[in-house]
Design a protein with these regions (language model features):
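Extracytoplasmic gating/loop element in the C-terminal half of outer-membrane beta-barrel translocons
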Residues: 234-344, 371-406
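Solvent-exposed loop/turn elements at secondary-structure boundaries
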Residues: 2-142, 316, 327, 397
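Hydrophobic, lipid-facing positions within transmembrane beta-strands of outer-membrane proteins
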Residues: 62, 72-76, 150-154, 213-219, ...
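Membrane-embedded beta-strand positions of outer-membrane beta-barrel proteins
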Residues: 1, 78, 90, 156, ...
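Short loop/turn motifs that connect adjacent beta-strands in outer-membrane beta-barrel proteins
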Residues: 84-85, 163, 224-233, 341-350
């Protein structure tokens, strides 16, 4: 085992955002008088400049005290040989965030509150307005010390004299964070970090990389040399089962729910049955002309809540970031290797690997959800604001969104095959 403070590879793009998003852009174009109709191009350029409009720029800044991400980490491992020459390995690892990235928008100021359910304090969230007359967004990069992760694993392994190696392992883990820093762009790291208060001090939630359960079974066979020592064969199969991927429950937004300038980054408030009756649903019409009345939308939302295990057990509160899990994922990979042993210890090896062999057997097997970031069962249709700045009360109206369940990734779920050749000496 051991303990220490660790820093991984630093994404310097987080720092370079401040150099590439300064609020000033220089662009040029070349217009030749030889182009038909451009004999008087000086006046044409002047007309464009005069008629043009200026959009407020966006800038990225880095707090002076910013430090590269660091974690305190401790691990302990034990290995024991059991009867039958079976190896048992136990390991635990714990990491505590010391410095991680956190993004905030300095152009925003709180001007009131928005109530997901009118009059229900538990559903209140800060309502923002752009306080800068010069900038659209001012994304500040600073640190947070919130966050931790741990993992406990156990593995059994047995090696047989005839060349078979068998291993099985199970890992239980938990990872929580404020911002996973999944984007290279400062603005994206801020706007896609789903939360109740999108510009607040930082809300802890499950990390996008959290995998509570993982099961792995591995079988490898390496044959002895045959055909007078010219050939040998290796075959491997690996099964991996994981408890799906994490995703957030959010609100789709036709109108900006909390005035932060971005639509779709607000976590869903899950109403109680009584609160649901107070929500302002309105009728909607889909692309085929089918009408959903307000009462039907309300009932459909209730049915969706009852069908989602997390929402059903967390009514009367905002959903946590990455609170939900996709279905359990099963994957089998195959490996076949054929070696030709030449003189002078030179070996030619031909390999065949089938990734996601499960899907090769049946197109409904081996599916994965890939990056299922969020689902939104309701749409914020319109925000009605009352009161003066500093004491604004905002209330939304909703429509129901029928496409509110994660779907498997078509590309990531497909099997693929790889052929290889190498010379070893």
């Amino acid at each position: 085992g051991g303990v220490g403070i660790f820093t991984g590879r630093v994404p310097f793009v987080w720092i370079s955002n401040a150099f590439t998003n300064t609020g000033v852009e220089k662009k040029g174009t070349t217009i030749s008088s030889s182009v038909p109709g451009m004999a008087n191009y000086h006046q044409a350029i002047q007309d464009v400049i005069t008629a043009g409009t200026t959009k407020k720029p966006e800038i990225a800044v880095v707090q002076k005290s910013f430090k590269y991400p660091q974690v305190f980490r401790a691990n302990l491992a034990v290995e024991q040989t059991l009867p039958g020459n079976v190896k048992l390995q136990l390991e635990g690892i714990y990491s505590k965030t010391m410095n991680n990235v956190f993004f905030e928008n300095l152009a925003l100021t709180k001007v009131g509150e928005v109530f997901a359910v009118p009059g229900v304090n538990a559903s209140a969230a800060p309502f923002y307005s752009n306080a800068s007359s010069a900038y659209e967004n001012i994304i500040n990069l600073k640190n947070t010390n919130k966050g931790y992760s741990y993992a406990l694993s156990a593995q059994l392994e047995k090696y047989f004299d005839f060349g078979l190696d068998v291993a099985a392992s199970y890992t239980y883990g938990r990872s929580r964070s404020v911002n996973d820093g999944t984007s290279s762009v400062a603005y994206s790291n801020w706007k896609y970090n789903y939360s109740r208060d999108t510009n607040g001090p930082g809300e802890m939630g499950y990390s996008k990389f959290d995998i509570p359960h993982r099961v792995m079974v591995r079988l490898n066979y390496n044959s002895p040399k045959y055909c007078q020592g010219w050939l040998s064969t290796s075959v491997g199969i690996v099964y991996t089962g994981t408890s799906g991927g994490r995703y957030s429950l959010t609100m789709n937004e036709k109108d900006d729910f909390n005035g932060d300038g971005w639509r779709g980054n607000n976590l869903l408030y899950i109403p109680t049955k009584d609160e649901l009756s107070k929500m302002n649903f309105i009728a909607s019409t889909d692309k085929k002309g089918n009408v959903t009345t307000a009462d039907q939308a309300r009932q459909l939302f209730e049915d969706w809540i009852q069908g989602n295990s997390y929402a059903r057990t967390h009514r009367g509160q905002y959903a946590e970031r990455n609170s939900c899990m996709t279905d359990w994922e099963n994957n089998i990979d195959l490996h076949f290797g054929q070696s030709i042993h030449l003189k002078n210890l030179v070996r030619l090896e031909f390999t065949l690997d089938v990734i996601n062999f499960t899907n090769m057997l049946n197109k409904r097997w081996g599916t994965t959800y890939g990056n299922a970031y969020n689902v939104s069962p309701i749409m914020v249709n319109k925000i009605v604001k009352t009161g003066a700045a500093g004491n604004i009360v905002a209330e939304p109206s909703y429509t129901y969104n029928p496409n509110a369940n994660p779907t498997p990734s078509d590309i990531a779920s497909r099997w693929h095959m790889q052929l290889g050749f190498r010379i070893a000496f």
